[in-house]
Design a protein with these regions (language model features):
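Short S/T/G/P-rich N-terminal loop/turn motif that feeds into the first structured element of a domain
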Residues: 1-52, 59-69, 92-94
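A common structural junction motif
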Residues: 29-32, 74-77, 84
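Charge-dense polyanion-binding interfaces
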Residues: 81-94
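Sterically constrained small-residue positions within well-ordered secondary structures
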Residues: 45-47, 80-83
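Short, flexible helix/strand-to-coil boundary loops that buttress conserved ligand/catalytic motifs
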Residues: 68, 77-80
Length: 94
């Protein structure tokens, strides 16, 4: 099992766009078959190093690659490129 973890820091003044991005990202659950579970969360502490996190679980690294290249994921991801100042990701075996 693979856990795919992504964190974002958003530009100031982009709160509405960030909320739209996170809402659409969460909506991918159930739409892309290879996603086993996922959680999209905002930081509980204002001013944290990162503003939001995605934690998804997949059976294999191949499933992670399929997810990353799925047109629905690509479309949602494109919403984030202009509003983020930083993004970090890691895939770990669980």
């Amino acid at each position: 099992m693979i856990q795919h973890i992504v964190m974002w820091k958003f530009r100031e003044g982009t709160e509405a766009q960030a909320e739209e991005f996170l809402t659409r990202l969460a909506a991918l659950d159930g739409q892309i078959e290879c996603i086993r579970s996922r959680a999209v969360r905002r930081s509980a502490v204002p001013g944290s190093a990162y503003d939001a996190v995605l934690v998804s679980e997949f059976d294999t690294l191949e499933d992670v690659a399929r997810y990353k290249n799925d047109p629905r994921h690509v479309a949602v991801s494109s919403l984030c490129k202009e509003i983020r100042t930083d993004r970090r990701a890691i895939d770990v075996t669980i």
